[in-house]
From Swiss-Prot:
Record: active site: H41 (proton acceptor), H148 (proton donor)
Tissue expression remark: Highly expressed in spleen (at protein level). Has little or no expression in healthy kidneys (at protein level). Detected at high levels in infected kidneys (at protein level). Expressed at low levels in bladder. Also detected in skeletal muscle, heart and bone marrow.
Record's protein name: Ribonuclease K6
Sites annotated Facilitates cleavage of polynucleotide substrates: H62
Domain of life: Eukaryota
Keyword Glycosyltransferase listed: no
Biological classification of the source: Eukaryota, Metazoa, Chordata, Craniata, Vertebrata
Subcellular location: Secreted; Lysosome; Cytoplasmic granule
Function summary: Ribonuclease which shows a preference for the pyrimidines uridine and cytosine. Has potent antibacterial activity against a range of Gram-positive and Gram-negative bacteria, including P.aeruginosa, A.baumanii, M.luteus, S.aureus, E.faecalis, E.faecium, S.saprophyticus and E.coli. Causes loss of bacterial membrane integrity, and also promotes agglutination of Gram-negative bacteria. Probably contributes to urinary tract sterility. Bactericidal activity is independent of RNase activity.
SMART domains: RNAse_Pc (SM00092)
Enzyme Commission (EC) number: 3.1.27.-
Length: 153
């Protein structure tokens, strides 16, 4: 059997791109969305990106390309969920913008393969937008909890 490679090339490329996108969007088994948000985005005191990202990458077993750490407590970020709703990038209306700018660090993958991922860091002081949902049984007992960092503004 001869495979018509040019005919199937777009499908092969799509499949090749799907795996990193799936990994980017998936949360580890056994974690609620709020707990995964906390692991990925909450860091009360600054750490070097190479150190901080190990805590994220150990769950997914790959080097996450870009990640932002908010230097705030989970409680303070969850308080943002009580502010007025705005539209998220995906069109849903469960996002909320922080009342004040916060310190944060953007970590960008510069090289290395898991588990030896290397990152550069960019310190910022900006507003953030989070998507919030009702908590699961294992989540902290807030009315709403952050589950996705939607945007930095």
């Amino acid at each position: 059997m001869v495979v018509d490679l040019p005919r199937y090339l777009p499908l092969l490329l799509l499949l090749e791109l799907w795996e990193p996108m799936y990994l980017l969007c998936s949360q580890p088994k056994g974690l609620s969305r709020a707990h995964w948000f906390e692991i990925q985005h909450i860091q009360t005191s600054r750490q070097p990106c190479n150190t901080a990202m190990r805590g994220v990458n150990n769950y997914t077993q790959h080097c996450k390309q870009i990640n932002t750490f908010l230097h705030e407590s989970f409680q303070n970020v969850a308080a943002t969920c009580s502010l007025h709703n705005i539209t998220c990038k995906n069109g849903r209306k469960n996002c909320h913008e922080s009342a004040e700018p916060v310190k944060m660090t953007d970590c960008s993958h510069t090289g290395g393969a898991y588990p030896n991922c290397r990152y550069s860091s960019d310190k910022q002081y900006k507003f953030f937008i989070v998507a919030c949902e009702h908590p699961k049984k294992e989540d902290p007992p807030y009315q709403l909890v952050p589950v996705h960092l939607d945007k930095i503004v």
